Amino acid sequence: MSHHDGSKPYQPRRGPERPPPPAPADDAAAHVAPTVDHLAAVAAEAEAMARFEEEHRALGAEEEYEEEEDELEEEEEEMEEDEDAQHHEGVGGEVAVPMDAEAAAQLDPHGGMLAASGAVQPMASNQLTLSFQGEVYVFDSVSPDKVQAVLLLLGGRELNPGLGSGASSSAPYSKRLNFPHRVASLMRFREKRKERNFDKKIRYSVRKEVALRMQRNRGQFTSSKPKGDEATSELTASDGSPNWGSVEGRPPSAAECHHCGINAKATPMMRRGPDGPRTLCNACGLMWANKGMLRDLSKAPPTPIQVVASVNDGNGSAAAPTTEQEIPAPATVNGHESST
């Protein structure tokens, strides 16, 4: 190949190098997705942990509240038992609350002993506690002779020989009640229990309406059923037949069927008809209920002759039916008897 200048072969010009094409959005999203998922998982886990901690705290608070209520109930039962025991022994039931040193120093020992008319309960070997009108007086280093003098002065009760030497058996109980916040909690619990047990109200208006509609006799609920002779008269019709309609609260039945004229005693039961309830016999009522029409009396079978047995002088012999009772009456044609 020949060249125009004969020095070097022809080389085409190269343009500026183009930047590489940007990465597609899907690839970027693919790189970001794991990070987003990880952050979402961490946030969900943190939220679950926070919810679990909150539920755990609520459950712990509820259990603590229940335990406090149980403990208050036990303390109240023990307090009542101790009060009953002290009452039987002739000592008033009081809550022994020891006073601090300053308050005890300000009190006059003689004035406190003379003003106190409550119980005497030693808390320690040489400690005297007096309670009067809600105020508690505590005296330290009291000899048994002084306690004996106070008891004789107040109620004439002698001191037991071993009272000064031994400690009281109710010391743990009184020690537990020495804390004011426990006493306050116990009082709040008593108030709450009193409202819970004795504050009864009608929760539903239906109960109130039913109670207002019911009959009363001297404030007591009474039955609406009749009593005595009134019940007997209402259960019996004017003709002596049982009036079952009055028993069931329904209108009384008719004395005979309004269609065929059969007596109410000769049918198993009276049924509803066009004239109202208990106006048709059993057969007519069934026809009316099933087909909506009254039965044809011309096709009805003849009524069987009833044989009436009469007892002669109580010997149990029944009289045989007569010929007239066995043979039915001859049929009439146009109001005249047919000739034989």
UniProtKB/Swiss-Prot annotation:
InterPro entries: CCT_domain, TIFY-like, Tify_dom, Znf_GATA, Znf_NHR/GATA. A zinc finger (GATA-type) spans 257-284. Residues 1-88, 215-253, 313-340 are annotated as: Disordered. Residues 182-224 form the CCT domain. Residues 48-60 have a biased composition (Basic and acidic residues). Residues 61-84 have a biased composition (Acidic residues). SUPFAM superfamilies: Glucocorticoid receptor-like (DNA-binding domain). Its main location: nucleus. Induction: By abscisic acid (ABA), and drought and salt stresses. Down-regulated by jasmonate and wounding. PROSITE patterns: CCT (PS51017), GATA_ZN_FINGER_1 (PS00344), GATA_ZN_FINGER_2 (PS50114), TIFY (PS51320). Residues 233-244, 313-325 have a biased composition (Polar residues). One of its GO terms (molecular function) is sequence-specific DNA binding. Keywords: Activator, DNA-binding, Metal-binding, Nucleus, Transcription, Transcription regulation, Zinc, Zinc-finger. Disulfide bonds: none annotated. It is found in: Nucleus. Gene3D superfamilies: Erythroid Transcription Factor GATA-1, subunit A. GO terms for biological process: regulation of DNA-templated transcription. Residues 25-47 have a biased composition (Low complexity). Residues 121-156 form the Tify domain. Belongs to the type IV zinc-finger family. Class C subfamily. PANTHER family: GATA TRANSCRIPTION FACTOR 28. Transcriptional activator that specifically binds 5'-GATA-3' or 5'-GAT-3' motifs within gene promoters. This is GATA transcription factor 20. It comes from Oryza sativa subsp. japonica (Rice). The lineage of its organism: Eukaryota, Viridiplantae, Streptophyta, Embryophyta, Tracheophyta.
